[in-house]
Amino acid sequence: MMSHIRLVLCSALLSMMSCPTSGTIGEMLSLAASSNSSICHGMQFTEPTESFMGILPNETLPMFIFSIMHSEAVPKVGKTLRISHDMKLFGGEAVNYMIFVNKILYEPISYYNYTGSCRQQGLSSCVRVYSDLVNGSKGNPSVKLGFTAIELNKTKNTDFHNLGFKICFSCRDHNGIRLVVYNKNNRTAQLMMCPSELIFSQDFTINSTSVNPSEEAAVPLLNVTGYTCIALHNKNMLTHHSPALSSGSKVDNTLEPGCDSNVGLFGHSTGTDYGWGLANFFSAGITNSLQISQLEHVTDAIACKIAKTSNYTTTALFLLNKEEGEIRDHVIEHEVALNYLLAHQGGLCSVVKGPMCCSDIDDFRRNVSDMIDKVHEEMKKFYHEPDPFGGLGTWGFYGTIFGHVLQWIPIIIMVVVVCFVCSWVRK
């Protein structure tokens, strides 16, 4: 019964929301999983510092550059678009901007004499942008943004009356900040948009003449309000910004073919010292060389075991690091999806209250990857010294027998000498 009620509620919630454009949710989720993915609330907002709206003759070259700033901020020198943040989409900390394009204007030649006009500034056409269309931009006067005739002529056709420019919102990466456009009217979000309601008769037609030389010629634009550009910002972007493991860290399990990691451990007691002492006495110190040889073999085996253990450990860390990163990305994706679905209610934290709503998931994948790389660099410092007697190994079993015979020849000679001395003394 409860599952049926939940299904009905979910269906009702989805029916309240307009169907988003194709790929909208996928774009937001892929954005959340990217290097600029946000932490707090799934979306943590900052005020954009550069323009993300312009009149574009094509998709690559903006016709003019202007900045976007807070309505209470001090205007910058140059073309500045001041836009109020009349809507808090995802909570009180968000700085969201509404953009209103009212009409496109052409100033007659007589406007050369008007101080501050586009014509007087050497510009030939303008777009009047309002920061608050409903309240008549109270406290925030409208701003006209213009572009030069040279720029207009770049796309001029045979009929110079029709120049065909579109007003588009571009919310692609800009100076390291990625933006998303959210439309509060139909509750859709896109990374880049030039919707049909922003286009008048397919393209804007900027007339080069006016019926009344003392008035502006205006082409009205309808249904263009209600768009908000949202800046997604990762607060860890200065320290842990890049995706982890992007440096191509690879686990190297290759060791020398002759690497033997079997280490024999012997118990040590007082009797051990006595035994080796007697052996050294009767063998005239020959057993010392045997001990040194055995110690060298054990040292090599220990180094080999350290290298293998290090590789196994770094492999485990590599996989755990990758798994933790994937879990973190999925958590952020789910937070963004919840914020997207609950946007009309103020976001996830407006519905679910509590101190843990803002989940701060630090991203240390890069740090772990760097440590793994350092371990690999240290392990590369292990190297094999050439064995001056390595050639004997090619003799196989006979080489081993020959080596043992050589070790016992001094002892055999000493026994023969002692026997000879004893026989001589008896005589």
Swiss-Prot record:
Residues 2-50, 110-400 are extracellular. Residues 72-88, 422-427 are cytoplasmic. It comes from the Viruses. The keyword Transmembrane helix applies. One of its GO terms (biological process) is fusion of virus membrane with host endosome membrane. Keywords: Fusion of virus membrane with host endosomal membrane, Fusion of virus membrane with host membrane, Glycoprotein, Host cell membrane, Host membrane, Host-virus interaction, Membrane, Transmembrane, Transmembrane helix, Viral attachment to host cell, Viral envelope protein, Viral penetration into host cytoplasm, Virion, Virus entry into host cell. One of its GO terms (cellular component) is membrane. InterPro entries: TLV/ENV_coat_polyprotein. This is Glycoprotein. The gene is GPC.
